[in-house]
Amino acid sequence: MKAHRVLVSQPRPAVVEKSPFYELSQKHKAEIEYMPFIRVVGVSLKEFRSQRVEILAHTAVIFTSRTTVDSFFHICEEARITVPETMKYICQTEAVALYLQKYIVYRKRKISFADGSFTNFIELIIKHKEEKFMLALSEPHKPELPETLAKLKLQLSLIHISEPTRPI
């Protein structure tokens, strides 16, 4: 039995010819269909305001993914909030930290990132313990990070800024 059509649960790449699935489709003469199963969407401004979190009252933002970065800055733009230059950003990986360049001027003294491990990430946050943190999360999320930060008794506000939906 040979497969003639293959479903890939990712969005269609910008350049299909550079996709690894293109070579497979040419080699095995199969048709490739791209359809993402889950799409992450930022919460509305009304839902964000119902959380009663003042963005400008914080001095540092903790990001764990690119989608939370997009959602955070989208909410700031929608609420007409100008994020101050003095805001510090703590990211779980370097990829997320570099993604911040899309929204802010990248300066090493205000952007910190871990190597992706949980312990390194917590150590990085402890280094900046005098800051007032805002943890940007998507729903659902793993409870380890908020629980660990609560045990450390840091000044912390949790905000839920994105949630998954099923595309039509």
Stretches with model-predicted labels:
Residues M1-S162, R166:
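Conserved beta-alpha
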